[in-house]
């Protein structure tokens, strides 16, 4: 495992270099990947997707290529770039995918020779279910408007004895900041420009998914949450909450569509030897993007180089705790990594 000093040196020495490079849209426009010329490029907050009618596997399954970036977003605002974030989350996702793919399914194709650190993900182009599937085991303190914590604070301020959250009737006095919930709660939210937490009944009534689809999604997610929780407990950590996205594949199966149990989509807290949550300055010792959210002081703030490097160190340290393995960075220029990985995928699948 890399020591704290080694991680700091890695980020300090290579941070600027690994953030350099073109977007996939620019690479395609420069005709660096001829097979993708004319394809649709969807640019997201932190990653981009590429697909087209002609981009299919040899047996006709539509392909979507997802390109992870180093961009970071909090409170629905882009805050800059974090060195190595793309590679860290790629390895984080790969590790978790191997734990839960038999339970949640996966849209990803396996490509021989593609490294776990590859920031290009080959996947089936699913019919997406327009819902963010959020599971919560603890009420983590959070500044995010859709969080259970913010809804609980509002209920307390209004003097309510109970409140409704995503279809759950909750006793205000039964909860405490960063405390464990009475049970694992499914708390879906919409996939809008500004997300909002909703009752599962809303999804069914508005045709987002069928009752059967939601039941499958909920049951599989509860099982996967348990699998990951058991793995982490053996490493002295606890899974606090997670957000996953799903879609329907060509075989009419509901499968995971995006990253699974990463530090961007989940919260992980460290445990003491007696199994209680470890605290520092009265707060849980956490491995998640919440650390970056806590650094935001105003709505339009951009992270400085020093802040970005500090966040990068936390990401790498978190990965090593989650996987129990040393972080192995790919130090090739970013453009080279993207082009070579994409060509390998296209040669293998199409």
Per-segment meaning from a language model:
Residues 112-119, 232-249:
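A short glycine-rich, hydrophobically flanked beta-strand micro-motif that places a catalytic Asp/Glu
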Residues 273-321:
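C-lobe/activation-segment region of protein kinase-like
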Residues 240, 244-293:
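Catalytic activation segment of kinase domains across protein kinase-like and atypical kinase folds
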Residues 209-240:
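A long amphipathic alpha-helix within ATP-dependent nucleotide-binding catalytic cores
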Residues 178-211:
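A short mid-domain helix/strand-loop element embedded in enzyme catalytic domains
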Residues 3-41:
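Short, Gly/Pro- and small/polar-rich lid/capping loops
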Residues 25-189, 300-350:
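Active-site loop/lid in soluble adenylation, ligation, and acyl-transfer enzymes
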């Amino acid at each position: 495992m890399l020591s704290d000093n080694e991680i700091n040196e890695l980020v300090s020495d290579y941070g600027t270099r690994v953030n350099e490079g073109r977007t996939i849209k620019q690479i395609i426009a420069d005709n660096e990947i001829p097979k993708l010329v004319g394809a649709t490029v969807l640019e997201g907050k932190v990653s981009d997707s590429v697909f087209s009618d002609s981009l299919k596997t040899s047996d006709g399954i539509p392909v979507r290529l997802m390109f992870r970036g180093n961009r970071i977003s909090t409170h629905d605002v882009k805050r800059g770039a974090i060195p190595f974030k793309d590679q860290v989350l790629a390895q984080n996702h790969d590790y978790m995918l191997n734990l839960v793919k038999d339970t949640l399914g996966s849209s990803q194709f396996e490509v021989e020779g593609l490294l776990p650190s590859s920031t290009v993900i080959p996947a089936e182009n699913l019919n997406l279910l327009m819902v963010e599937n959020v599971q919560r085991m603890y009420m983590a303190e959070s500044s995010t408007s859709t969080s259970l914590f913010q809804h609980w604070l509002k209920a307390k301020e209004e003097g309510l004895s109970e409140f409704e959250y995503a279809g759950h009737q909750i006793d205000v006095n039964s909860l405490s900041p960063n405390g464990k919930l009475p049970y694992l709660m499914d708390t879906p939210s919409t996939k809008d420009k500004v997300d909002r937490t909703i009752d599962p009944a809303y999804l069914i009534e508005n045709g987002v998914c069928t009752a059967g689809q939601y039941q499958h999604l909920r049951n599989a997610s509860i099982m996967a949450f348990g699998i990951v929780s058991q793995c982490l407990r053996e490493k002295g950590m606890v899974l606090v909450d997670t957000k996953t996205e799903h879609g329907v594949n060509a075989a009419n199966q509901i499968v995971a569509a995006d990253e699974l149990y990463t530090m961007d989509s989940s919260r992980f807290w460290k445990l003491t030897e007696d199994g209680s949550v470890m605290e520092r300055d009265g707060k849980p010792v956490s491995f998640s993007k919440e650390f970056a959210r806590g650094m935001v002081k105003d709505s339009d703030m951009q992270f400085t180089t020093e802040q970005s490097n500090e966040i990068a160190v936390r990401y790498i340290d978190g990965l090593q705790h989650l996987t129990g393995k040393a972080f192995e960075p790919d130090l090739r220029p970013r453009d080279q990594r993207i082009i070579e990985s994409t060509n390998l995928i296209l040669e293998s699948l199409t």
